[in-house]
């Protein structure tokens, strides 16, 4: 596919003091901690608005993975977040469980829209080309949600997390998977110093 983009911009001699600047933060837990929410963003101090999330999920356990709530802790929230979702699949637009039926079986269906989607699913690592083994890998998924129409505003601080909860034939259960994410937001400067990216070996897919 080929996509053409054009960008318009304005040149100014100076910017107002209240100008918000774009920020992004990458994180990964190669094995999430059982019973502990995965942190998408933390340590955001100041005033601004949250505009998007990308999550890459390699599932390491069987059964459905998307029951964990996405939570936004805003301006001093501690035990309870201001915004608490109903499941990761709902946050990324999959209240229908991304379900598609083929040959009498239910499979996950990818999809894309301007503001949220599930564009990537694979059980094969196409980057692998080795004569001694195949390219099988744990199921890999990619999701995005852009808060263009529904930005999450904060005046003092922001933390974003997601529970690791799935469901199987015995009901809900805590999961441990390989999760990485990018959080996107605008905020007024100054901002907190964030950790540097880890070595490339620690960022490779499983």
Listing of model-derived features with the role each one plays in the protein:
Residues 5-206:
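Beta-strand-centric surfaces of beta-sandwich/beta-rich domains
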Residues 1-3:
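Positively charged, low-complexity/disordered segments
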